């Protein structure tokens, strides 16, 4: 790694520690030319797969779009911010775990519904009604009946 002070190539690691619950490594380094010390942080680069829309278009995964849908479904529901954040993290982990470069938008919707079903049944029905385009009250009733089984 280049020294930020003198741009020398030769630096050595003095100390390494895990930080951020083991998701990041903090390293103290010393330049062998000017003896200045500096800190670096190392994290894994985790790329999200691209999304294949129902019309066949491909676009980058948009976390804000997913979070917005989840938050709308959970609006005025007694679910903590921590629980919501954990659900979002689990969805993203499952998407990365597929190992695919592209995933269908339907998969993301199903993962969201799976998490909402565990978080709050009312939020699940709200999301499902939009996601599955419920046309009438009968479809709501059928989905509620499936929840009760």
Swiss-Prot record:
- Zinc-finger ranges (unnamed): 3-34
User: Which cofactor is essential here?
Assistant: Zn(2+)
Q: Please provide the record's keywords in A-Z order.
A: ATP-binding, DNA-binding, Metal-binding, Nucleotide-binding, Repressor, Transcription, Transcription regulation, Zinc, Zinc-finger
* InterPro entries named in the record: ATP-cone_dom, NrdR-like_N, RNR_NrdR-like
Keyword Cell inner membrane tagged: no
Write out the GO biological process terms: negative regulation of DNA-templated transcription
Please give the function described in this protein's UniProt entry.
Answer: Negatively regulates transcription of bacterial ribonucleotide reductase nrd genes and operons by binding to NrdR-boxes.
Q: Which family does it belong to?
A: Belongs to the NrdR family.
| The name this protein goes by in its record | Transcriptional repressor NrdR
Q: Which organism is it from?
A: Vibrio vulnificus (strain CMCP6)
